[in-house]
């Protein structure tokens, strides 16, 4: 009896099989790693290593080890590059997975599981990517040999149409059917539309251990239950109604035609028999191109009307990110356009016959070969669909991540009282490549650890200091709008060029590390930062009166009206200074023939008036961190969003992307919190957001893209068990606010306001 007790409570024998890994990170430019896996039982010291597989990012080992696992033991499986492990301690690390005791029990006897590789610790700067496939078997389930497993099937992401792979909170993979709105554990093999009965309704939050309906009906509610049959019929009717396609679906293309899309998102139609292609939809007769659009009703959801540079109308499909000349309402409602009344049948037949493939000769005048569709807007081609800013930003982040060193940190320690000068001294003594390292900021005298929140607050406070017009580096562009521009009289500070260099570096660091500057410049400033020329239109947002005056000069005959020369004046600290727009411009009059040159030179001078050296210093600092060529895909408005984020706070977006911890939407704390937020003005909402996240700015994608210590992390309201005399606490690295269970709305409002306005500093719990 005693022996059996020892066996029951002592170490358990498990067989761990390390099958393969996939998509490992490539850290060398010219060669691939030699991966091997190392298995360590934390607690007992058992250690095993697999064979080394040469020159691959997708190694296959298929080796097993018998382990004795205690009640509190954990298993660490790490992947290493054999080529580098001898260089120094920790070299060659490619990722690891740590299985705690609860994870071991959950994964045991569940077959092969794909696990994401992670870093050794949260502060580790090594880049990690990929997955490893392992299985755990109990001793009584271990056979003489394991089944042959096709590793490629474990990583096959080509799911049938209508399916999506997701993970539960515990990490188990489930498959979502978008047609039947259901989920299942088994990997699907047929398109979603062929599944008539759902695995699990999406509206139900079913625990992953709850029995579900299997093909043979062995688990769950019996298949012949009349309630199930009734629900199934009703659900099928609902699906048929929701998936109906005959009302507003375009008719099939004529025989021999295919619809294709260029790499730029331009839709065209190819006639496979003749090899010619056209922008025009062959389903729509050409004589219907001038039909009254009001008769067709509104555009389908996600569509937009735009004009080319030559004024031709085209249509943008934001759902599929494509563009086309054909009105989508024409092809979708063709039967209504061609048959407006019973008497219109003959006209319909004639119109349809004119668009048949037999009349290709007539259409050939506007077609080109498939591989040579013209791209010049003057050729009336459909404009390219510009990828949305989020996608372009994602590409920029990927480019920047490749430049980040694998080791080391950019450490900055400053005091809150001297944040500007101390940051200036530390940042300016670093090399540009040091600024690419993982940013670690510490406020002197505070214990907070920087997992992103401290750096965000540092940039927030530093922005307010370095962009403050009080220091003379910048000035407001207009009295009524608080956008900034470079102060042409900044030379009163003899070190001003070095400070502009510093400002450029800080802006670059914010973009590189995924943070934001709390301030805004004029749009022409961002245009200059991109290296694009300034035009008269850029003047309108900066100086509307001057813009109107220059437009009047261009639009009217100034002969005998204006007595201007190519020389302008401006006031510098009470002194009138003259500036010649061209050599000897003081003696050159502005005439009807030279007014365009005068306006062009005036605009360039207005934006670069006395700031050429300052701007070049700032641009140099910015491009030291963010190379100029990486920004070619962006325009000035997009660059403004990248540098400054979204200043406008959308409360509805905030609410819908907030996580609740130890509370529900119906909890008083949650209701009172949002009531307080709605009562705040924009400035106070920004202060609240800065208090909780470290930044008053919202990411481009909205609140769903708030960043935490290790990737996106939603804004979180956490009701804690604490004295109601305490103030709310914020965890900026996790975007979480801890709120005690206050007795009333007024008390929550006062405590929250006090925390926002009267507190500062970081500590460690």
Swiss-Prot record:
It is found in: Nucleus; Cytoplasm; Cell membrane; Membrane raft. Residues 351-369 have a biased composition (Polar residues). Residues 431-765 form the HECT domain. Gene3D superfamilies: 2.20.70.10, C2 domain (2.60.40.150), Hect, E3 ligase catalytic domain (3.30.2410.10), Hect, E3 ligase catalytic domains (3.90.1750.10). It catalyses: S-ubiquitinyl-[E2 ubiquitin-conjugating enzyme]-L-cysteine + [acceptor protein]-L-lysine = [E2 ubiquitin-conjugating enzyme]-L-cysteine + N(6)-ubiquitinyl-[acceptor protein]-L-lysine. Pfam families: C2 (PF00168), HECT (PF00632), WW (PF00397). GO terms for cellular component: cytoplasm; membrane raft; nucleus; plasma membrane. Its EC number is 2.3.2.26. The active site is at 733 (glycyl thioester intermediate). Its main location: nucleus. Pathway: Protein modification; protein ubiquitination. Residues 157-190, 251-284, 297-330 form the WW domain. Keywords: Cell membrane, Cytoplasm, Membrane, Nucleus, Repeat, Transferase, Ubl conjugation pathway. One of its GO terms (biological process) is protein ubiquitination. InterPro entries: C2_dom, C2_domain_sf, E3_ub_ligase_SMURF1, E3_ubiq-protein_ligase, HECT_dom, Hect_E3_ubiquitin_ligase, WW_dom, WW_dom_sf. It is an enzyme of class 2 (transferase). This is E3 ubiquitin-protein ligase SMURF2. It comes from Danio rerio (Zebrafish).
